[in-house]
Amino acid sequence: MKTIWCFAMLAMVFLATGICAAEVPNLLGKWTGSWSAYDEGIGYSNLTENGSFILTFVEQEDRIFAGNMTFKPENEAEGGKGFAGAIGLDNKTLYFVEFDKGYTLGTIISNDEIELIYLADGENGSVAIDRLYRIKA
């Protein structure tokens, strides 16, 4: 009986270790995709074939990351800004702060696909949903 108990305890330790040791996703690199948005004073918009959006994860140390994004809506000047964020304990949830304004919450759908929801409050409030795919080198 003691032997069975010892094996059961040993098996539980190994299983618990495997569960806790989930690998942190590597987000480094460039991602592109589409967006739909609503901006106060402008209304609804989305990415067209003449626009572009590139999100680049430049640095990542464990669950903390930083990078920059460039976007060019159709018939508008190109813009860019930096961001930093963290991956949640579930290794699926993303939290960003964009350096000029706003916050982004996201979900890692797969190694090569993420969805982001951007929120900015105040006088020029806006919301956007982005579906991004990793650009393969």
Predicted regions and their residues:
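Positively charged n-region of N-terminal signal peptides that target proteins for export
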Residues: 1-5
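Generic hydrophobic-segment detector
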Residues: 6-8, 23-24, 57, 75, ...
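Bacterial N-terminal signal peptides
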Residues: 7-16
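Alpha-helix termination/capping residues and helix-transition junctions
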Residues: 13, 24-25
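Sec/Tat signal peptide C-region and signal peptidase I cleavage site
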Residues: 17-21
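Beta-sheet ligand-binding and adhesion/scaffold domains
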Residues: 25-56, 84-137
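N-terminal glycine/threonine-rich, aromatic-flanked beta-hairpin/loop signature
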Residues: 43-82
